[in-house]
């Protein structure tokens, strides 16, 4: 066939998913040609029918690890080698080739998809396009965005997958991995043992159920590769095998085979019901059935998930590179809202978040190599060492401004106060410098309007990741953020508003001329909104005029009014309590522990106590001048109210002294260590150990010994857990409570006489409740 002959056929539709089918390098020209990749695209035409399409692209060597957090370079030959290993293993092998080099696979997945998008020309999955396919080669050459399509709001068609595969894995191998890595997740340890040693139980049953809008199947197997012992529904109602003959570069002809779904392009799985291993067992069975018959090039089958990270990850997801070609989404619950959240994240990021982590939005960018900083920003940053007026803002605030005007605990009243926060602040600055990144800009714009809450962690991850991936861009954003803080501070001061505390993307302060006796809450809020608008204009002017940035009006920074307040109490830069007595709305209390439900309950009571203290002073001071006599009366009543508060709290927690979830804390990374061997006998519980662990402290049999940490979520519900050491959990909480009350007593003491001290030791008095 003459490779120069092209016969195009055009078809309207959209792309639902894209996955690498196979990859290779051109012999003898590795550096020049990069990595050749054959993509399988699951598409839906304008008639609503799913169609398979294939595209060949070349990922240049310099792009392969461009946004890798760990730097360095992996050759195209290495990528081709790992792909070959993932498509040539035994049919019953587990798809765990990425185990041990998951970052390399994430780079491959992200960079290849980014290249595919740029080469073909589509904007995103589910956006309407016109496909141009060469009938001579069978390859998709181009996708032309269809801005005038009648149906421009395509969404995923979801089905539900439920599976149960209680696989037994050699406990000694899991234990060895756990001990060797000093704190690895047990899910990682189990996968490592599974990859090395396989199943220890040859007759592991598998129960699978798939529900789609128009089909239902259920299969029950006594063992994975034996005929089903229970059968319901036809697999042909779910998907069909499709083969295509393709002609690749170099006039090389191959035959490919895919499972083409009939009525879905996403399968959702409830993570509380179906483990990742159960999904993999199901897909492994289908892979063996689909490719047991020779005559075609087998696709890659490789798993990427949080279990592949030795320390686990904060988020749950499921991704396979290659087979099966459709998307598998993890949901927190089977509820419709949870499914909607998962599909929204998938659509807005083409499935790259959270799979590729901090690199996700870099792979969604319209460029390969990141563009340089805008010239004026670069020039200003270069002047920092000589410009001493700005040195502190960039040196002392190297992660963003954190400052307060107070050197000691302070209480404020009589004047209206307000708290402000920039929406999606740091990503907004990035988009102001690089407005061509439309995918990121769309999400940032939605966050400004309080939309796409599910992608807030993605934006936080993106900005934090810049420090590792593009440190010069990160420093520039911090520089601009600090300049904005100075601009806002000056603008606010000119409007009669003094900023008290500024923390990165938000601040609170006091209106110097708005007296709470003369101005109502609605009027104060109007003043706050006017101030926000004035600051927004000043910041926009800074970005456009002084920094020379050119961005659309829709992306201008938004300063949100968090609330207006009549009273404030602050004891440190990050610790404050703000309350509106006129409206009696819930106070804004920050800077106290909240890691457990017990901590959150005490925080709520502390916030209420601070409201009570305010009301006591308002009552005592009414029509009087605040003096040391009134202070002593007030302080005595506050101390008494504090006693009632902690007694009420102890009564509350006493009823929950046997409830692990109430006391449970998330283990900090610095605390992570190897799990005791006693946890290794519950395999089905270990599969869930890929997130930060929840711990409780239980009493030591030795009354003089420290409490023992128990990973209670890794134990079955029938496990007998020793008595919870409630006192150990309460000690830091009560310490914070007592400290803040004493700061409050100091803050209200405007006199030379010593402050009354809250000297109670609540735990010493009530420890008997928890013995």
Swiss-Prot record:
The keyword Acetylation is annotated on this UniProt entry: no
Domain of life: Viruses
GO CC annotation, single: host cell nucleus
Record-level Gene Ontology MF annotations: transferase activity
Keywords: DNA replication, Host nucleus, Transferase
Stored HAMAP family: HSV_HEPA
Functional note: Component of the helicase/primase complex. Unwinds the DNA at the replication forks and generates single-stranded DNA for both leading and lagging strand synthesis. The primase synthesizes short RNA primers on the lagging strand that the polymerase presumably elongates using dNTPs. The primase-associated factor has no known catalytic activity in the complex and may serve to facilitate the formation of the replisome by directly interacting with the origin-binding protein and the polymerase.
Protein family membership: Belongs to the herpesviridae HEPA family.
Name recorded for this polypeptide: DNA helicase/primase complex-associated protein
Biological classification of the source: Viruses, Duplodnaviria, Heunggongvirae, Peploviricota, Herviviricetes
């Amino acid at each position: 066939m003459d490779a120069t002959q092209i016969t195009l056929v055009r078809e309207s539709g959209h792309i639902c998913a894209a996955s690498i089918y196979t990859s290779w390098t051109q012999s003898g020209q590795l550096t020049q040609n990069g990595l050749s990749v054959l993509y399988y695209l699951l598409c839906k035409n304008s008639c609503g029918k799913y169609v398979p399409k294939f595209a060949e692209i070349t990922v240049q060597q310099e792009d392969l690890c461009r946004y890798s957090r760990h730097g360095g370079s992996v050759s195209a030959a290495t990528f081709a080698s790992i792909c070959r290993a993932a498509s040539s293993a035994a049919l019953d092998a587990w798809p765990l080739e990425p185990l041990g080099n998951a970052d390399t696979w994430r780079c491959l997945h992200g960079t290849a998809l980014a290249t595919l998008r740029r080469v073909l020309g589509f904007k995103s999955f589910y956006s309407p396009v016109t496909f141009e396919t060469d009938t001579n080669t069978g390859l998709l050459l181009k996708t032309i965005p269809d801005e005038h399509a009648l149906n421009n709001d395509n969404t995923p068609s979801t089905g539900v997958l439920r599976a149960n595969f209680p696989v037994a894995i050699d406990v000694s191998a899991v234990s060895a991995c756990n001990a060797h890595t000093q704190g690895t997740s047990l899910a990682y340890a189990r996968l490592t043992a599974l990859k090395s040693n396989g199943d220890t139980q040859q007759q592991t049953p598998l129960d699978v159920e798939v529900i789609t809008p128009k089909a239902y199947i259920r299969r029950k197997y006594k063992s994975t590769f034996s005929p089903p012992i229970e059968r319901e529904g036809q697999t042909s109602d779910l998907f069909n095998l499709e083969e295509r003959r393709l002609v690749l570069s170099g006039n090389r002809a191959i035959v490919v085979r895919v499972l083409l779904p009939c009525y879905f392009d996403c399968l959702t799985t409830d993570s509380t019901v179906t483990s990742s291993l159960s999904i993999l067992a199901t897909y492994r069975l289908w892979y063996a059935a689909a490719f047991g018959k020779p005559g075609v090039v087998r696709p890659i089958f490789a798993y990427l998930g949080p279990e592949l990270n030795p320390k686990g990850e904060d988020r749950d997801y499921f991704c396979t590179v290659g087979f099966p070609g459709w998307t598998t989404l993890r949901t927190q619950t089977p509820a419709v809202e949870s499914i909607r959240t998962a599909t929204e994240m998938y659509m807005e990021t083409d499935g790259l978040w959270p799979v590729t982590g901090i690199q996700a939005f870099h792979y969604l960018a319209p460029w390969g190599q990141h563009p340089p900083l805008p010239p004026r920003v670069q020039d200003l940053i270069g002047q920092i060492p000589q410009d001493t007026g700005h040195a502190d803002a960039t040196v002392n605030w190297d992660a963003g401004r954190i400052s307060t005007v107070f050197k000691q605990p302070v209480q404020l009243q009589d004047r209206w106060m307000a708290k402000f926060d920039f929406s999606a602040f740091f990503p907004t600055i990035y988009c102001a410098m690089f407005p061509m990144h439309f995918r990121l800009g769309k999400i940032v714009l939605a966050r400004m309007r309080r939309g796409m809450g599910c992608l807030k962690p993605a934006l936080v991850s993106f900005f934090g990741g810049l420090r590792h991936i593009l440190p010069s861009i990160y420093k520039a954003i911090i520089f601009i953020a600090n300049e904005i803080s100075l601009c806002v501070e000056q603008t606010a001061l000119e409007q009669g508003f003094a900023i008290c505390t500024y923390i990165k993307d938000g601040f609170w302060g006091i209106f110097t001329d708005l007296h709470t006796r003369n101005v109502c809450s609605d009027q104060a809020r109007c003043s706050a909104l006017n101030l926000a608008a004035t600051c927004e204009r000043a910041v926009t002017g800074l970005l456009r005029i002084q920094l020379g940035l050119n961005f659309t009006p829709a992306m201008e920074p938004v300063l949100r009014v968090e609330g207006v307040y009549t009273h404030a109490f602050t004891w440190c830069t990050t610790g404050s309590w703000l309350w509106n007595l006129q409206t009696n709305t819930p106070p804004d209390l920050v800077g106290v522990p909240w890691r457990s439900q017990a901590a959150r309950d005490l925080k709520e009571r502390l916030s209420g106590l601070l409201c009570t203290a305010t009301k006591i002073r308002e009552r005592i001071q009414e029509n009087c001048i605040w003096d040391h006599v009134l202070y002593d009366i007030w302080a005595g009543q506050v101390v008494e109210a504090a006693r009632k508060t902690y007694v009420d709290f102890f009564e509350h927690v006493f009823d929950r002294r046997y409830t692990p979830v109430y006391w449970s804390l998330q283990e900090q990374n610095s605390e992570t260590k190897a799990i005791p061997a006693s946890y290794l006998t519950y395999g089905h519980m270990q599969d869930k150990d890929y997130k930060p662990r929840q711990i409780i402290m239980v009493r030591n049999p030795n009354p003089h010994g420290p409490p023992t940490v128990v990973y209670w979520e890794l134990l079955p519900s029938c496990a007998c857990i020793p008595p919870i050491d409630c006192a150990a959990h309460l000690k830091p909480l009560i310490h914070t409570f007592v400290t803040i009350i004493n700061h409050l007593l100091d803050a209200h003491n405007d006199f030379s006489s010593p402050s009354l001290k809250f000297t109670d030791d609540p735990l010493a008095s009530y420890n008997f409740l928890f013995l």
